[in-house]
Amino acid sequence: MRDQFISLALMLCVLHSACGLYFHISETERKCFIEEVPDETTVIVNYKVELYDPRSNGFMPSSPGIGMHVEVRDSDDKIVLSRVYSSQGRISFTSHTPGEHVICMYSNSTAWFSGAQLRVHLDIQVGEHAIDYANVAQKEKLTELQLRIRQLLDQVEQITKEQNYQRYREERFRHTSESTNSRVLWWSLAQTVVLVCMGFWQMRHLKSFFEAKKLV
């Protein structure tokens, strides 16, 4: 089974919006998406699976017997979530380490649907965009002003997380650059030492050769 990685460079910011798309897969295909997420950030994944109907030349919504296996791995390649869901659902998880989170999806379709083409609608929401404020206002009985203040506070918190994540990325990049420069320096020194040793050995060898031939 071949992984098809679709890199989604979705850096969070205040203007960051949800990512909505759809893609086609067969029964044996596996699609993976990369989402860069700060730590302690909520991610919501909404999806819907449709089965291709050759009679109507279209896709049937909510086909029975079709589900999706969803697996989420964090930046340390640890499994955050792995389970089988129905043909339509909403998945939620919270990141505990900053960095790239890989979201992989593949069909768990039975032999009845073997070889069929599927269309998967996918919507990924990160941070404040993953919060249903209408539901929050209803549950906590917030006024419009209180809800707006809550949204602003969440935005400030998300901006802080994003800034911390950017600093983390800059520090990691700096360490990588310093490590690369150090390796290049040591490799250059090693090459220089090898060349000097080879030159010295060749000179000794030539001197011995000339002495043996009584040319010097």
From Swiss-Prot:
SMART domains, per database record: EMP24_GP25L
Signal peptide residues on this chain, from the entry's feature table: 1-20
Motif Prevents secretion from ER: where in chain: 213-216
Residues exposed to the Cytoplasmic side: 204-216
Keywords: Coiled coil, Developmental protein, Endoplasmic reticulum, Membrane, Signal, Transmembrane, Transmembrane helix
Protein name, entry field: Transmembrane emp24 domain-containing protein eca
The encoding gene: eca
Entry GO CC: endoplasmic reticulum membrane
Function text: Eca and bai are essential, though not redundant, for dorsoventral patterning of the embryo. Specifically required during early embryogenesis for the activity of maternal tkv, while the zygotic tkv is not affected. Involved in Golgi organization.
Lumenal side: 21-183
Organism: Drosophila yakuba
Record GO biological process: dorsal/ventral pattern formation
Location of the protein in the cell: Endoplasmic reticulum membrane
InterPro entries reported in the protein's UniProt record: Emp24-like, GOLD_dom
